[in-house]
């Protein structure tokens, strides 16, 4: 709990494919994967309820506002109606989205899109978080700020698995696999 595990390697090494298999989004040819003791192949829905996943490519809905994206993902992750608005407001506070919550996500700068993607992945308070090259294409300042959010989540006990090909990002990790 609370560790950041890095999967470091060049493009094409299979980092994203490995993540997709561990999250139940791609079927492995063999072996097993368990999330919180739940076999991802036998009970994918239950296993996925314990994890958040931020894809390398944005999974945001550009025609929805920042707030609407958060509300949508809260619904997808099963946050009930009574708690949804409260949780969305908490996320807006945590990520300091107050001034931009009514902007369409397609109009957000890249760094804010990255942060919104992370916010959507953690909206349901998962104990495990998969981040697939979360800072690719973002400027240095946005990368540092993004990693501040990641380390804050780890301090709260969230276990984080992150793929990267940046050596300086690997330094944030408690453990690394090549």
Regions found by a protein language model. Give the residues of each.
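Conserved ABC transporter NBD signature motif
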Residues: 31-42, 46-47
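Conserved ABC ATPase "signature" region
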Residues: 71, 75, 82-100
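Conserved ABC ATPase signature
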Residues: 104-111
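Hydrophobic anchor residue at the start of the ABC signature
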Residues: 118
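Catalytic Walker B motif of ABC-type/P-loop ATPase nucleotide-binding domains
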Residues: 129-132
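Helical segment within the ABC ATPase nucleotide-binding domain
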Residues: 144-156
């Amino acid at each position: 709990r609370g560790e950041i595990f890095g999967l470091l390697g060049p493009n094409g090494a299979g980092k994203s494919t490995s993540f997709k298999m561990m999250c139940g989004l791609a079927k492995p040819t063999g072996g097993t994967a368990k999330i919180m003791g739940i076999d991802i192949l036998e009970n994918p829905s239950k296993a996925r309820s314990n994890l958040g996943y931020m894809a390398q490519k944005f999974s945001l809905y550009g025609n929805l506002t920042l707030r609407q994206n958060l509300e949508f993902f809260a619904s997808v992750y099963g946050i009930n109606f009574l708690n949804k608005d409260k949780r969305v407001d908490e996320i807006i506070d945590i990520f300091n989205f107050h001034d931009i919550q009514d902007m369409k996500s397609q109009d957000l700068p890249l760094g804010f899109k990255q942060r919104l993607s992370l916010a959507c992945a953690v909206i349901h308070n998962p104990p495990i978080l998969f981040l697939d090259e979360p800072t690719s294409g973002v400027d240095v300042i946005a990368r540092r700020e993004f990693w501040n959010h990641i380390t804050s989540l780890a301090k709260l006990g969230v276990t984080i698995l992150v793929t990267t090909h940046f050596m300086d990002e690997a330094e944030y990790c408690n453990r690394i696999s090549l």
